[in-house]
Amino acid sequence: MTNHEQVLTDYLAAFIEELVQAGVKEAIISPGSRSTPLALMMAEHPTLKIYVDVDERSAGFFALGLAKASKRPVVLLCTSGTAAANYFPAVVEANLSQIPLIVLTADRPHELRNVGAPQAMDQLHLYGSHVKDFTDMALPENSDEMLRYAKWHSSRAVDIAMKTPRGPVHLNFPLREPLVPILEPSPFTATGKKHHHVHIYYTHEVLDDSSIQKMVTECTGKKGVFVVGPIDKKELEQPMVDLAKKLGWPILADPLSGLRSYGAMDEVVIDQYDAFLKEADILDKLTPEVVIRFGSMPVSKPLKNWLEHLFGIRFYVVDPGAAWKDPIKAVTDMIHCDERFLLDIMQQNMPDDTKDASWLNRWTSYNQKAREIVLEEMANTTTLEEGKIVSELRRLLPDKAGLFIGNSMPIRDVDTYFSQIDKKIKMLANRGANGIDGVVSSALGASVVFQPMFLLIGDLSFYHDMNGLLMAKKYKMNLTIIIVNNDGGGIFSFLPQANEPKYFESLFGTSTELDFRFAAAFYDADYHEAKSVDSLEEAIDKASYHKGLDIIEVKTNRHENKANHQALWEKIATALKALD
C-alpha cells in the first residue's frame, strides 16, 4: 500500500458516498482501465446498484431509459478516449428531454494531455452545450480540503442534474497510476463521519396574484383548448381533466401526455385530432380564442400546422424549465411556473358556469366519430397491417404495463391508432432529439422500473441497437419487443422523397433484408414471427407471463401501410363533413 493509493481511495470514496446520499441508486459502468478506481469503488459500495455494459453507446441509452422511468439521477462511467465520445447521442437526448444523467469520464492526468499519450484526447467540455454543467475535477490530494471538495462537487452535480429543467452533467476525472484503490477494509465503513452530507431542497415556481388574475380573466368564458405534448407527470392528469371540464375546453392529448391511458375515459380528452385537423372545411369551426400548451410539442404534424396558423389568439406555453419549447413561435404568454400549481390555482379561481357547451360538443362529436371509424376499421381488419398491430397492442396490453415506443413510424402509428382506453399504460419514448438509435437500450433501462415492459420498434431502429440486447441476456431482464418489419425506412413513404422513384429505395427505403430470428438466438431471446392476428395475440399473451427477453416480429409492407393510412383519413374526412 502506498500513500497515493490511500489518497485516491479516500477522495473517490467521499465523492461516491455523497452521490448515494444525494439520491443516486444506480450506476452504469463501461469497462476500461483509466476508470478502474471509480469502477471498483462503485462496485464496493454497499447500496449502489451497478450494471456493466461493454458498449458505451448502449450504456448511455440504458442509463437514459432508467433515469427517464425512475425520475432519479443515474450515473454513467467510462474510461478515457473515444469511450466518452460514444456517450454523446444519449447525452444529447438527455439534454433535450430533460433527463438527469451524471456522466463521469476518466482522463489522463494533466502531464499526459496534448503530448501524444495513448488513449488520450481533449475531454474538456466534450459534450459542449448538451450538458448543464462541466467540471474538470482536481487530482486527489492528501488533505481534508480535497475530501470536502470531492463531496461538494458530488452534491453539486446531483443538484444541477435534478434542478428544473433537469438534464445531464459531466465531470471529468484525471487520474494517475497506480489505479487500484484500497478495498480492504471497506472504504465506505467510516465515510461521512468526518464531513457532513449536503442536504438539497427544491421549490416550485409560482405566479404572483396579479398574473394569476390576468390569466383567469383572459380564459373566463372563452373558447379554448389545452394542448398536452410529451410530459411525464402523472400528478397532472386528473387536475387537468377536472379543469378542462370546468372550462368546457377539449384536451388535445399526445400519446406521451399520459392522458390517453391514465385509467379513465373522459370525453374532454381528444385523441383523433391528427385525423380531423387535416381538413380545411373543419378547421374554420374549431378556431379557439385561447390555447394553453403543456409539455413538448406533440408528434402530430397536422396539429402543429393548425397551431402555427392560429392568429390573433392568446397562446400560453407553460414552461417551468424556461427552455422556450415553442418551435412554431406562436407564444403570446410564456408561463414559467410549476404546472400543478397553475392547474390548482386556476381551478380555485375560475368562476363556475361560464363555459360554452357547444364549443366542447363540437370537438367531442368530431373526435367520437373519428374514433368510431378507427376502431371499426381495425375491428374489421383481419391482416396484420401496421395500424392493426397498434390496435391489438391497445387491446392486449395488461393493465399497468409499460410501453416504450420507437421513433419514426411507431410513434406516429400510436398517435393514430392508440385511442383513449380505461387502462393504465405507461408510455415512454425518446422524443428529445427523436433519433432511432439507442431505443432498445432505453427500453431495457426503463424495464428495470416498469413491469411488464413492451417495446414497439421498427426494423431499422432495432438493427441500430442490437448490441443493447446483451444487457437483457446478461441481467436476465424482462422485455417484450414487437418489431414492425417493413424492410426499411417506412416513414419516408409519407414524405416528398417518395416522389423520386429513381433514388428512393437506395437512399431512403434502404431495405436490409435482415432475418432477426438469428439476433434473437444470439441473445437467448424467445422468438416468434406473428403472421396473423391470432398468432400476435398468442405471442403477446405468452410474453406477458414469460420471464426474460421475447422478440415478436411482424412483417409488413410500407407501401400498403401508406395506402391504408390515406384510406382511413379519407373515410374520416367524409364522415366528419356529413356531421355538419
From Swiss-Prot:
CDD domains listed in its UniProt record: TPP_PYR_MenD, TPP_SHCHC_synthase
Broadest EC class assigned to this enzyme: transferase
Record field: catalytic activity: isochorismate + 2-oxoglutarate + H(+) = 5-enolpyruvoyl-6-hydroxy-2-succinyl-cyclohex-3-ene-1-carboxylate + CO2
InterPro entries referenced in this protein's UniProt entry, alphabetically: DHS-like_NAD/FAD-binding_dom (IPR029035), MenaQ_synth_MenD (IPR004433), MenD_middle (IPR032264), THDP-binding (IPR029061), Thiamin_PyroP_enz_TPP-bd_dom (IPR012001), TPP_enzyme_TPP-bd (IPR011766)
EC identifiers of the protein: 2.2.1.9
Pfam families the record matches: TPP_enzyme_C (PF02775), TPP_enzyme_M_2 (PF16582), TPP_enzyme_N (PF02776)
GO terms for biological process, alphabetical: menaquinone biosynthetic process
Molecular function GO terms recorded: 2-succinyl-5-enolpyruvyl-6-hydroxy-3-cyclohexene-1-carboxylic-acid synthase activity; magnesium ion binding; manganese ion binding; thiamine pyrophosphate binding
UniProt key word Metal-binding: yes
HAMAP family: MenD
Subunit structure: Homodimer.
PANTHER family: 2-SUCCINYL-5-ENOLPYRUVYL-6-HYDROXY-3-CYCLOHEXENE-1-CARBOXYLATE SYNTHASE, PROTEIN PHYLLO, CHLOROPLASTIC
Identification of the protein by name: 2-succinyl-5-enolpyruvyl-6-hydroxy-3-cyclohexene-1-carboxylate synthase
Taxonomic source organism: Listeria innocua serovar 6a (strain ATCC BAA-680 / CLIP 11262)
Designated gene of the protein: menD
